[in-house]
Amino acid sequence: MWLFRSGEDGLPPIVLYHYTETRARYNAVDFLDGFSDGYLETDGYQGYNNLPGIRRCSCWAHTRRYFIDVVPKGKQYDYSNPAVQGVQFCSKLFEYERRSQNKKHTFEQRKAYRLEKEKPILDEFWSWLDEQKPRKGSRFET
């Protein structure tokens, strides 16, 4: 089962469920045929990679989960651990998203709020990420 949902643009969302017998990449390619020059926010499924005319965006909840999965279990948080730092970046973004939702921002207000509050966090995150050396075989290895 595939789920496609429109973005949060101030209009009522469009939600489409599409059943296929497999989750093969060609199903996404066929369904999204004609959708171009747009953004597609996805989970980590590799079948979405390199879809023609589409810029893929990662889901922050999934990104955060990848960091959480490698945080050492059963210990107090070690804030020098890169996985813990990655979780903290994501948590800051989620906190600002919650605040924006609680303030019931319009689409334009949310965009301005994100540029003011979240963009500096994202800029810092990307710089931090460039300095990291992911372990061989990890989801973050390029």
Where are the predicted features?
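Catalytic center-proximal scaffold of phosphoryl-transfer enzymes
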Residues: 1-142
